[in-house]
């Protein structure tokens, strides 16, 4: 692996956080509360926890830097749109297709980051991207190939927008990572998402007559602590050490690890498709970690990278 200890730290932080994110489905499965209610509680609690454990002073200091406040606001609003459109896609499409469209964000990042961030697309990124995205397709193939697959134009539009806004979130977070800590991004993000989602969350919770039971508390706490406060802060901070294209590929360890947590905590046996897809995603992540270039700001395009890969093969 090229690069120094900081680069290794970045891969460890992003990869470790992605593994933690893989348990999100377990926490969500513990509660019957409306998604908007869970989101607002989760993000508000996560922001409060990070602020309480030392992030508040950094947030106040760093958010006042020139140009940072606007980007923090944009980051939070992108997260709101991404989360909302993903849930809309889940409502109008089968789960497999909604997840597939959302996880297309690494492709969008590979296409635009050379032009927006001046980050060269390496040949190894092209290979790793093909492996990782193929892994997602293989994992979801039983649902995607189902003749009864549920389709709708609004659902497809929401799914594509979810993937695009997730890519935009990564790109904006990358521009912020040189100026602020992961805790600052997490606090701002949590507050913005909670404020926007709270009215809808309260309306759906009160209107549906949902009781708030102990399992709901543990679910929200688990999501807030592991999937957001801890995992989110570490992930966002780790982005500063590695190229954003690498971040999006290593981040796909999340769906690869989700079946492991489902097996351990819910006794759900993974299928052969799931295991094969997870292996492909892992192979893609390992490629960028071991063979990714250390330079973070060279210019280049995916087309040039493909040409390099063909020339060296």
Positions of PLM-derived features:
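Hydrophobic alpha-helical transmembrane segments of multi-pass membrane transport proteins
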Residues: 19-23, 27-30, 53, 73-88, ...
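Hydrophobic/aromatic residues within transmembrane alpha-helices
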Residues: 31, 38, 89, 101, ...
């Amino acid at each position: 692996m090229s690069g120094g200890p900081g680069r290794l730290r970045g891969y460890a932080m992003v990869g470790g956080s992605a593994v933690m994110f893989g348990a999100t489905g377990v926490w969500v499965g513990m509660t019957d509360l409306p998604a908007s209610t869970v989101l607002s509680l989760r993000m508000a609690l996560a922001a409060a926890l990070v602020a309480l454990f030392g992030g508040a002073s950094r947030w106040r200091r760093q958010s006042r830097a020139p140009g940072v406040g606007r980007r923090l606001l944009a980051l939070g609003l992108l997260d709101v749109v991404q989360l909302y459109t993903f849930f809309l896609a889940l409502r109008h499409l089968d789960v497999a297709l909604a997840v597939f469209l959302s996880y297309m964000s690494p492709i969008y990042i590979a296409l635009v980051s050379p032009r927006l961030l001046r980050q060269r697309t390496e040949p190894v990124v092209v290979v790793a991207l093909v492996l990782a995205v193929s892994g997602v397709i293989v994992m979801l193939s039983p649902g995607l190939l189902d003749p009864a697959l549920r389709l709708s134009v609004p659902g497809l539009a929401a799914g594509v927008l979810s993937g695009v806004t997730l890519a935009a979130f990564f790109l904006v977070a990358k521009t912020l990572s040189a100026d602020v800590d992961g805790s600052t991004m997490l606090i701002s993000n949590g507050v913005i998402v909670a404020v926007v989602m709270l009215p809808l969350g309260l309306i759906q919770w009160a209107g549906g007559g949902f009781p708030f039971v102990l399992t709901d508390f543990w679910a929200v706490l688990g999501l807030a602590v592991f999937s957001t406060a801890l995992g989110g802060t570490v992930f966002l901070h780790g982005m500063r050490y590695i190229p954003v294209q690498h971040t999006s590929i290593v981040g796909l360890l999340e769906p690869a690890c989700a079946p492991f947590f489902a097996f351990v905590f819910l006794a759900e046996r993974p299928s052969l498709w799931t295991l094969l897809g997870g292996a492909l995603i892992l192979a893609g992540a390992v490629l960028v970690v071991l063979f990714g270039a250390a330079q973070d700001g060279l210019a280049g395009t995916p087309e040039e990278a493909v040409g390099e890969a063909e020339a060296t093969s």
